[in-house]
Amino acid sequence: MKKIIVLAALILGFSVAAAAQPRAIGLRIGNGGEISYQHTLGQNFLEVDGGLGLGFDGVFNVGATGIYNFMIAQPQWTDRGEWGFYAGPGATVGLGLGDANYLTLAAAGMVGLEYTFWFPLQLSLDFRQHLGFSFGEKPFWAPSSIALSVRYRF
């Protein structure tokens, strides 16, 4: 009986902890499309984006970016919903296949503005810069993008 009570308390504790960690999933549309996932860690959040694309050079691209964003400010511009300015560092790994094959490793930085509605929808506009190396056809890699993200918060 004691083990059942301890097990029930652990399950309840993990459920409460999971409910207290807001997450969001959606699309990030900029130079291409990416699936975007955010996980709040206290005041800040981790963002992981992954995408597929076909570049202008005929190369099929697949890549993933992970960024730890710091919430810089949360101005109270509206009565409902929440605004937030954020910025953070991260890393990108990518692979290009086609006429030019390459592997890309890069540092990434992002700065953005988000609005979370009073219902579970979030919009954000961000600027992301990459700086790194490609092993293969392209020796140096430094693209940037401006993107709009739409996410469902849960």
Question: What do these predicted regions represent?
Answer:
Residues M1-P22:
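Cleavable N-terminal export/targeting peptides
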Residues A19-P22, N44-F45, A73-G84, D99-N101, ...:
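Short loop/turn motifs that connect adjacent beta-strands in outer-membrane beta-barrel proteins
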Residues R23-A24, G55-D57, Q76-T78, L97-Y102, ...:
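Outer-membrane beta-barrel domain signature
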Residues R23-L27, L46-G50, W83-A91, L105-A107, ...:
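Transmembrane beta-strands of outer-membrane beta-barrel proteins
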Residues I29-G33, L41-Q43, L52-F56, F70-I72, ...:
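Transmembrane beta-strands of outer-membrane beta-barrel pores
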Residues I35-H39, A64-F70, P89-V93, G109-Y115, ...:
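Residues on the lipid-exposed face of transmembrane beta-strands in outer-membrane beta-barrel proteins
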Residues W118-F154:
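Predominantly the C-terminal beta-signal and adjacent terminal strand-loop region
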